[in-house]
Amino acid sequence: MPKRTLEEVRQFVGNGVRLLMIRAVPDGESNPLFEETFALFKDYYGEHCNDNTKPYAGVVELIETLKKKGYAVAIVSNKIDFAVKELNDLYFKGIVPVAIGEKEDIRRKPAPDTVFEALKELGKTKEEAVYVGDSDVDIETAKNAGMPCISVLWGFRDKEFLAEHGAEYYAETTEEVSELIAKIEE
């Protein structure tokens, strides 16, 4: 398999693990080694999902602030569900009660299914919710769920890319996320 640059990998992520591997493996699913490679990747990721992983600066404090203000918070990701739950327990235990990742019985983002599942578990409606994300997939997911979306600028996509994909609200800092949520709520 070819080595991939960081920029290539950054462009591959966001649409789920299988599509990540389809993009990364030459000839995608047509490659006779694809399924074996995909299985190896999932096993490796399961053992190493926490390697070089940590919350972005200020995110834990943002979540704690939002919870103190009475907001409910959930994580919805296209990462493998067991990894999402493991990372949530490691970094956000006690402050994020719902964390949902990619699993076979529910469509992944940009379909709104995981968002609706999170809202159901939180006892909230889409009218009470704001989606916060860092990608075009997040913008599309929020649109499909009928929710406003705040696009953060510290993730894998820049402001120009997000604007090209329909972003309406931007946050450069976690403080701006909190301010925008209050503004959208008005």
What label would you give each PLM region?
Residues 1-61, 68-69, 94:
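N-terminal helical cap/lid subdomain that shapes the substrate entry/recognition surface
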Residues 6-7, 32, 67, 81, ...:
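Asp-based, Mg2+/Mn2+-dependent phosphohydrolase catalytic module
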Residues 12-14, 72, 131, 153:
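Short glycine/serine/threonine-biased micro-segments
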Residues 14, 80-81:
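Short "lid" loop at the C-terminus of a central beta-strand within the Rossmann-like core
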Residues 15-17, 59, 75, 102, ...:
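Gly/Ser/Thr-rich helix-start
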Residues 43-75, 81, 85-89, 112, ...:
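Short, acidic loop-to-helix structural element flanking the phosphoryl-transfer center
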